[in-house]
């Protein structure tokens, strides 16, 4: 690593630590020429392949900006969006692939967004999945209702089974 002070081509690593929830490594370095110390942060760079052939670095902020538009007027906080962005990035990094098609990023957003807010999910999915007709919306709404009723039935069963348990 080149020294930022004297531009010498080499440096010595004094200390390495995992940081940023395990997604980066912080290294403390020292230049053998000027003996000044500096810190570097290293992380795996994910590259996004867009439909038009352009490649660009993955940006969690760009994911959050795209989802924020779908969440306008909904009870979704900045903290909720930050967590969604983290979940999407973690899911993509877990695949262990450095180059990601942009379509996969959209698909990775859909699951966490569905859990966060169903209306925001419908808004995002309508653009991302290219809904063209009212039937497309109706099909997706029916799917969301089915999932919601399945969750309600499951939680009701859990409550009923807990009521059957003895108190002592």
UniProtKB/Swiss-Prot annotation:
Its cofactor is Zn(2+). Residues 46-136 form the ATP-cone domain. The keyword Zinc-finger applies. GO terms for molecular function: ATP binding; DNA binding; zinc ion binding. Keywords: ATP-binding, DNA-binding, Metal-binding, Nucleotide-binding, Repressor, Transcription, Transcription regulation, Zinc, Zinc-finger. Residues 145-168 are annotated as: Disordered. A zinc finger (unnamed) spans 3-34. One of its GO terms (biological process) is negative regulation of DNA-templated transcription. InterPro entries: ATP-cone_dom, NrdR-like_N, RNR_NrdR-like. Binds 1 zinc ion. NCBIfam families: transcriptional regulator NrdR (TIGR00244). Negatively regulates transcription of bacterial ribonucleotide reductase nrd genes and operons by binding to NrdR-boxes. Belongs to the NrdR family. This is Transcriptional repressor NrdR. The lineage of its organism: Bacteria, Bacillati, Actinomycetota, Actinomycetes, Propionibacteriales. The gene is nrdR.
């Amino acid at each position: 690593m080149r020294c930022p002070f004297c531009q010498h081509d080499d440096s010595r690593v004094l200390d390495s630590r995992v940081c940023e929830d395990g997604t980066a490594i912080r290294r403390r370095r020292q230049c053998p020429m000027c003996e000044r110390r500096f810190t570097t942060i290293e992380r795996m760079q994910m590259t996004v392949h867009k439909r038009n052939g352009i490649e660009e670095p993955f940006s969690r902020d760009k994911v959050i900006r795209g989802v924020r538009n779908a969440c306008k007027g909904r009870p979704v906080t900045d903290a909720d969006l930050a967590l969604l962005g983290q979940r999407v990035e973690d899911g993509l990094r877990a695949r262990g692939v450095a180059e990601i098609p942009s379509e996969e990023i959209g698909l990775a957003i859909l699951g966490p967004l569905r859990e966060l807010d169903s209306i925001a999910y419908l808004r995002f999915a309508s653009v991302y999945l290219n809904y063209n007709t009212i039937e497309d919306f109706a099909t997706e709404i029916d799917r969301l209702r089915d999932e919601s009723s399945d969750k309600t039935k499951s939680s009701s069963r859990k409550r009923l089974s807990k009521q059957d348990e003895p108190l002592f």
